[in-house]
Curated annotation (Swiss-Prot):
It comes from Conus textile. The cysteine framework is V (CC-CC). This is Conotoxin tx5h. It is found in: Secreted. One of its GO terms (cellular component) is extracellular region. It comes from the Eukaryota. Contains 2 disulfide bonds that can be either 'C1-C3, C2-C4' or 'C1-C4, C2-C3', since these disulfide connectivities have been observed for conotoxins with cysteine framework V (for examples, see AC P0DQQ7 and AC P81755). Expressed by the venom duct. The modification 4-carboxyglutamate is found at E7.
Length: 12
């Protein structure tokens, strides 16, 4: 997890 929430656009 790169962000507090699991979003595909978070790390992408």
């Amino acid at each position: 997890n790169c962000c507090p929430i699991d979003e595909e656009s978070c790390c992408s």
